[in-house]
Amino acid sequence: MFDLLQQTSRSFAVSIPMLPNPIREEVALAYLLFRVADTIEDEGSFTPEARSEMLTDWIDSVRTCSTEGTEHWSDFSSIPHSGYVALMEARRSLIERLKSLPLPHRELIHQYLAKTVAGMDQFLVKNDAWHDVGELREYCYYVAGVVGEMLTAMFTSYDRRLLPAEDELMRLAPSVGESLQLVNMIRDYQTDNERQRLYFSEAISFDDLLALATESIESAREFLDILFRYEAQPGIVAFNAFNFSLAERALQNAKSLGHYKLDRADVRMATQSIRAV
């Protein structure tokens, strides 16, 4: 499972192993289940209607712990990213791992993935660019903010020291995922613009994107501060500190250096920033 993580997300392949077990395994599995949905949504070689049907198949598979409804899916070898091809081919083994989790843990993952899939489907049906900042914010919530909520539910369930701060953490939880989503959009903005693949309407400027990312990162900072204040389990703090550091550095690069990519030095600095945790 962790080899799939390395093939599909360089940043989470670093941060998820920082978590303690058993939550480490569950977060890794949940990430990959969400990543399957992301891959379906992003696969432009399928029509929006076909992708919508596949998303329904996938959430049914997660709910029932059976891949019977996905057996008719097409070959994904045309996907240019080999890691995503491997992920799609591994969906049966992912569902088998999910089946081994306690029922409440399976239900939690399904609950949040169902919310994300419903949001993805809503935007697939529209099949149009985001018309304003409100729509962009809503999209980011469904595809990333919900992940932050799921992670927070996992953290507070695992580490009872966080229970007194649960309401405050859940209020800020969407920012944990949205900050990463927004800096990914910033990172890809230049390339997408060059390839004429932008999904923004003219009503959304690059400055709007920077402003949303800045706001989200400030909320993620508050989230991290609460983890420190309540002396959360060190691995949970390290996971969040690493992801926050990467997002913050990517935003700083975009604002001050005029480029959007993170290189190995950025990842190394993010790792060094949490070694004291």
Indicate residue ranges for each PLM-predicted region:
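Catalytic cores of Mg2+-dependent Asp-rich isoprenoid enzymes
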Residues: 1-180, 186-277
